[in-house]
Amino acid sequence: MERFKKASSIIETLKQQGHEAYFVGGSVRDLIIDRPIGDIDIATSALPEEVMAIFPRHVPVGLEHGTVIVVENGEPYEVTTFRTESEYEDFRRPSSVQFVRSLEEDLKRRDFTMNAIAMTEEGKMVDLFAGQEAIQKREIVTVGNAADRFQEDALRMMRGIRFVSTLGFSLETKTKQAIETYGHLLEHIAIERITVEFEKLLTGTYCVKALKELVETKLFSHLPYLQMSEEKLLKATQYKWDSFEADIEAWAFFLYCIGEEHPAVFLRQWKFSNKKIKDIVAVLLTIRKRKEKDWDTVFLYKTGIHIAEMAERVYEAMIESYDHTAVNRVQTLFQALPIKNRQEMNVTGNDLLNWASKKPGPWVAEMIQKIEEAIVQGNVVNEKECIREWLQECNLL
């Protein structure tokens, strides 16, 4: 409760001004579950302009949705006016938002009962939709009619399965049936938003359970490049997914599991950044080489420790070896390298030009590369004079 105590002065101030105010959302859910608390959100009957008038230190981030960030005790908190939402457009966005003075009306519009629990500053729960019961049963249940909730916002179906992965809960029967029925609506949702949820699914503690739900609900068939992947997704559930330390590793392993032959095309379709695509593809290419040969100094140096560590963890998952001794060996081997990158070389192109008395040209870059490999392989010490002598001995000057 310590983190809530820091924010409780906001609720107390709002109440002193004649308004209602409560802690709401994921932070309340996580407190009940005893998970680490993320962002703390507050819902209030005060209108946005009233919130801004009461708290001088504020940022009006989403006034059309009733949200104001209030800075209290050096921490930012989202304070949002109770609201209802009218008809939804594109199965994602409400066409308009109406501010209301009723907590019940505000909680009624939320996705799942576990996320529709409010809490007073004293820690008393206001649970109008049996959210605590769902948490006790470890069930994901929609607020009200599941069909209505998913037709309002189709992304909620992906969120539901993402919560299976992060919390280990199960989809309640009617909620699961509604996902099977309305899964096609997911095709109306921007892929960027789906990618965010899918990444949380892949990196969740209970990823295997979530992948099974993805198959059982047929929701996978409405995702780009996964329409024909039922058997491969089921194969993916036979592996352990808890050894990865980065989302790049999880995506690389997922692409391996589904046998994706053109990973860059897949990732572009899912709207990944170029940097992330480059890293994921680099991990996969490294694994392909790793299958053919063990690590040596040149292979490791050219790969770099960042990609090498990730590739080794994914490779361990592929061969179902989870003791991390191979990762530790890669780290030890890398630390023993004479240089970790080209910037650590004690020779420059200007040095070569001075020594050789030749005109600049492609030969300089070629020579730097030869020296670099010789240093990495231990054939020459990374000192300027040693490098010069080595070049002379090899008749390269």
UniProtKB/Swiss-Prot annotation:
Protein name: CCA-adding enzyme
PANTHER family assigned to the protein according to its UniProt record, in alphabetical order: CCA TRNA NUCLEOTIDYLTRANSFERASE 1, MITOCHONDRIAL
Task of the protein: Catalyzes the addition and repair of the essential 3'-terminal CCA sequence in tRNAs without using a nucleic acid template. Adds these three nucleotides in the order of C, C, and A to the tRNA nucleotide-73, using CTP and ATP as substrates and producing inorganic pyrophosphate. tRNA 3'-terminal CCA addition is required both for tRNA processing and repair. Also involved in tRNA surveillance by mediating tandem CCA addition to generate a CCACCA at the 3' terminus of unstable tRNAs. While stable tRNAs receive only 3'-terminal CCA, unstable tRNAs are marked with CCACCA and rapidly degraded.
Binding site for Mg(2+): D39, D41
Keyword Chloroplast included in the entry's annotation: no
Miscellaneous comment text of the record: A single active site specifically recognizes both ATP and CTP and is responsible for their addition.
A GO MF label: magnesium ion binding
Residues where CTP binds: G26, R29, R110, D153, R156, R159, R162
Subunit structure comment from the entry: Homodimer.
HAMAP family: CCA_bact_type3
EC supergroup of this enzyme: transferase
Enzyme Commission number(s) from the entry: 2.7.7.72
Cross-referenced InterPro entries: Bact_CCA-adding_enz_type3_sf, CCA-adding_enz_C, CCA-adding_enz_firmicutes, NT_sf, PolA_pol_head_dom, PolyA_RNA-bd
Cofactor(s) needed: Mg(2+)
GO terms classed as biological process: RNA repair; tRNA 3'-terminal CCA addition
NCBIfam families reported in the protein's UniProt record: PRK13299.1
Keywords: ATP-binding, Magnesium, Metal-binding, Nucleotide-binding, Nucleotidyltransferase, RNA repair, RNA-binding, Transferase, tRNA processing
Reaction catalyzed: a tRNA precursor + 2 CTP + ATP = a tRNA with a 3' CCA end + 3 diphosphate; a tRNA with a 3' CCA end + 2 CTP + ATP = a tRNA with a 3' CCACCA end + 3 diphosphate
Family annotation (CDD domains): NT_ClassII-CCAase
